[in-house]
Each structure stands twice: as C-alpha cells, then as structure tokens.
Amino acid sequence: MTAKFLPVLALAASTLSPALAQNTPYSAAGKQAQVYTTAQGTGQRLAAGPALSFQPAAQPAETQVCVFVDPAHSFQTLLGIGGALTDAAAETFAKLPKAQQQEFLRAYYSPTAGIGYSLARTHIGSCDFSSASYTYVKEGDASLKSFSVKHDEQYRIPFIKQAMAAAGGQLTMFVSPWSPPAFMKTNHDLLHGGKLLPEFRQAWANYYVQFIKTYEKLGIPIWGLTVQNEEMATQKWESCLYTAEEERDFIKEYLGPTLKKGNLGDKKLIAWDHNRDLLYQRASTVLDDPAAAQYVWGIGYHWYETWTGSSMLFNNERAVKEAFPNTNLIFTEGCVESFKLDQVNEWRLGERYGNSMINDFNAGTVGWTDWNVLLDETGGPNHVGNFCFAPIIADTRTGKLLYTNAYYYIGHFSKFIRPGAERVATTTNRDWLQATSFRNPDGKVAVVVMNSGDKPQEFQLWVKGQAASTTSPAHSIATYVLN
C-alpha cells in the first residue's frame, strides 16, 4: 500500500458539544452514491462498486424495504475513531520487518491507502497488555521526585510518534490509568483491585499531571484523560476500585482542581470508563453534582457488559443523553476476548464491531476507540494471560500481518466518516438492516448499512423524496458516500 499522509482535522472543543437536532437543507436530486462493500464469502473488503444514481421516488409502501436518511436533521459532531496504542502493540510492532511496519502504519492511519484513524488511547503505567507490571516512581515516593517514563521510551513512545506521523502529525490522544502505585493502595498491590488510600489522593492526582506534562515535553500532545480504567472490576491484572461517590469526590476535590492548578484545565476529563450496564447510575452520580460536573467533559464506556449474558445495553447510553444532553459520550474500549489464532477469519469479529458502532453513534456517541491496534500470534503479549483479538494480528514468526474482518468493519466508519462530521437522522424499516449516517465537513454524506442476516436484502436508499435501489449481501457492511 502507498499513500500520502494527510493531516487529521483538529477539532475545537466548542464543536463537540452535543445538541438537539438541527435543520440544514439538503437534496439528493442529481446526486450519486459511491458504494464500498465488505461481504462474507466474497473477496470484497472495502471494495468499490458501481455508483448508485438517485431518482425521484413516490411514497414507499410498507412492503418496500428502505433505509431512510434525512441530512437536514443533524445531531452530535464526531471527535474521531481509532484504537489504543499499548505496550503490547508497540512491542509487537517493533518485532516486524520495516516493510510491514510501514504497511501497518498506512493501513491504520492513512485516510487514502488505509482507514484513517484519528483517535487514540494509551495507558498511564502498566496494564494487562504490558509484558510486566511497572510504575513511574520508586516505592514510597509520594513526592514523585523519582518520576520517569524511561520504561515507555523503549517501545511505546517511539511507536506513538510513528502513528502520529502517519496520521499527518496529529492524533487526538487520551490516557487512562489501570492502577496507582502499590504503596498508594489499600491492598499494596498493582493487581487484584484494591482502592486508593485517602492519604494519597493528592499524590495520585499529581501523578496524572506529571504524566501528561512529561509526555507533552516528549512531543506527544494529550487531549484528555479518564479517571480510572474499569472502576468496578477486581482484575487479576492492574486495577483499582471506586464507587460512584468516590469517583465523584476524587474528581471535585483532587483531580479536577489539580489539573486546573497545573494549567491542564483544558484537558478533557472522562468519567466512568467501564461497561454500559452501570452507565447511567455512574454518570448521574457525577453529573448531578455541579462541583464535580464542572470538570467533566464526558462519560466513557466499554462493551463488556455481555459477560453477564446480556446483550449490549445501548439504551443506557440514550438514557444518559436524555438526562444530560450537554455531556459527551465516548466509547473508550472494546475487543473480542479469548484469542485463538485459528479464529482470526471468523465473521463474528467484525459484526460485533458493526453492531456496536452503529448503535453507539445512533445513541449520541462522539468518539469510538477500539482496544489494542495490534497484537501478536498469541493474542498478546499480556503478562497475565488475558489474550484477545485485535483488528490486525502480526505473526511475528513470519513477519506477516493478518487482517481480521474487524479491521474492515471499523474502516467502513473511520475511512468515510471524518472528524467534524455531524450525525444525521437515519432509520430502517426492517430490523435486520442497521444503519447510521454522517454529513462530513466537505458536505458528503456517508451512510453505513449492515446486514447481519443469512440472506441478501434488496432495499431503497431513500433521501427526502429521492431513492436509489441496491442490495445488501448476507453478512455484509457497506458505506454509501453521497457526493
């Protein structure tokens, strides 16, 4: 793959405030839609097909299958779409031959030859997808005089810088801690949950500031941060627990004021950063307190509530948006767990992403962040054996990159829906077709339609009295770009 790297559009904070639907005139008369398709049982992977032409259309009958798009009514503005730049991804990247390293960077970060990632997450200190546990200070150093990110300078920082360069010099980057240093915790352990000791709340708030300032001095701008990764999970890896009230109070009494005092008040602070199941309860506890809410840009969430046997709980996102329309929702992590190399071609991987992304955006989400952008042939490295899938797997034994269909499913959004795009009204009249649409800053409208059923489905793409006839293949996703 070859490409020219184009700059990622920088967004002013003011453009990201969620709003009620706004009315902007739009007509599809005389327009065409370029079609890009990924379909099971075919060689189509983001494959361009014949353009569709729009013609005047009468009132559709109930027997006609339609995807209705109304670009005149717009909603939230897209911050970006991307994935996490972890120790595991960086170490795996370093093992690849130079040619495959460049292929990887183009594949993710070029908006022309790749899928144009514009959003990224990384971790403060170690996480499960590190080769070992570590912190940035010596044991007992609450003053942080020994603070150093020397560990990250071997793999992760150079990796992030190469990703930034491939994205045109800028990525919207947010950071998340998995655990405070062990001496700051009730269980004196980086792993296995535990809580932040009250006497170290200020030292821990200072730690975030020190990390952000250090990374920025090294040339990595930080856009925002989450309070804590997965605050309700006692994990066998790095973890730390907060009740909703503890998180609220830490934000308003320590983290928020400390960021402000450290001249980092412009960094976007994200609360929760865990599953959709408790999303409303956690968000409302923080946002109903003005002293805490003043520091909070948005609420982050993951998709792992399915561990209970539940389906994904998209209505909980909608509940937050209904109650707190001026807060932002951001998907901060998701991956398919229980890695097996012989399953990298399974179609379920991509369909999980497509289902989540369509419903998350339709619920008001402004940014969507996958977990590891790259893992090796074991689904790691991971120092506690929590091996998972990534959209791209590197077989470090051969140097070959393996593209799962999740990469292409994500690309149907990230390549064609760019930062600054506004979501527009979209509905379907059959539940086996899912769809979302955005109007890009250049005026083009991108409509993503997913068919997770076993049969192809003819339908009309219907836009304000103009329609184009097309077919959605079985187990497929397609993006229609209206010029």
Which residue ranges define each predicted feature?
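Conserved, mostly hydrophobic/aromatic
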Residues: 83, 116, 173, 225, ...
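Bacterial Sec-dependent N-terminal signal peptides
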Residues: 1-28
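N-terminal catalytic cores of secreted or lumenal carbohydrate-active enzymes
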Residues: 46-222, 243, 253
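Alpha-helical scaffolding within the catalytic cores
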Residues: 60-70, 157-159, 210, 253-254, ...
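C-terminal beta-strand-rich structural cap/linker in extracellular carbohydrate-active enzymes
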Residues: 471-483
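Aromatic/acidic polysaccharide-binding cleft in carbohydrate-active enzymes
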Residues: 328-409, 425-428
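Active-site neighborhood of glycoside hydrolase catalytic domains
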Residues: 203-224, 231-337
